[in-house]
Regions:
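Mature N-terminal segment immediately following signal peptide/propeptide cleavage
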Residues: 8, 12-25, 39-49
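Surface-exposed, low-complexity/disordered Ser/Thr/Gly/Pro/Asn-rich loops and linkers
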Residues: 58-87
Length: 201
């Protein structure tokens, strides 16, 4: 915690926060979302997760895949990191989960949960309750969790993160791509809600 009114749920891994985050591929989780987001659920076979972070950088941290920025590890032809256009969205859909305490000093106050930078879709579960669904690039939300958290006790936050709806492919390049998206791959990535940016050299 950085002040008495806010709690940052940063992971111990990499960020040196106070919270243990775990992750597991959603397709390998047979339990219901309600159970996953409930106290006592067994995550002993889940991987450590980096939060804030991404599915891929957590997988790289766990040595599931090599560092994408080294050499040609990230080239499609290398096959070292599965490309979503080949393996599908489910391959990179993951659960993230942590436990957190709500201080006694929060009693009688309105308590908000503020997820930041979600990409691309997410379900936000707290203590067995689906409280929000997010859609878009680097999305934030403000969720009133007052009636769903237990003050002075341990609580569970579980987030199911989905990649973009239409990943597109790295090739072939298409001049007939959707809208203005002519610069890479088949342009289908532009069918998703994205952010405006400009690049140049």
């Amino acid at each position: 915690a950085r002040d008495s009114k806010r709690i940052w749920l940063d992971s111990k891994e990499i960020h040196h926060g106070e919270y243990v985050w775990k992750m597991k591929k959603a397709g390998d989780v047979i339990s219901s979302a309600e159970k996953v987001s409930t106290l006592g659920y067994d995550t002993s076979d889940w991987l450590s997760a980096i939060v804030p972070g991404t599915v891929l950088n957590s997988l790289v941290y766990n040595k599931e895949y090599p560092e994408p920025y080294y050499g040609v590890n990230n080239k499609l032809e290398s096959g070292k990191i599965p490309d979503i256009s080949k393996v599908g969205r489910e391959f990179y859909t993951y659960w993230f989960r942590t436990e957190f305490d709500v201080p006694e000093s929060f009693a009688g106050k309105t308590i908000w949960l503020q997820p930041d930078g979600v990409n691309y879709r997410a379900e936000i579960w707290v203590n067995g309750n689906l409280l929000s669904t997010l859609n878009g690039m680097f999305i934030s939300d403000y969720i009133n969790v007052t009636d769903f958290v237990k003050v002075g006790r341990k609580n569970i936050l579980a987030v199911k993160v989905y990649p973009v709806d239409v990943p597109g492919t790295t090739m072939p390049k298409s001049w007939g791509a959707t809208g203005e998206f002519h610069n890479g791959g088949n342009g289908n990535i532009g069918l998703n809600t994205t952010m405006l940016m400009s690049v140049g050299w």
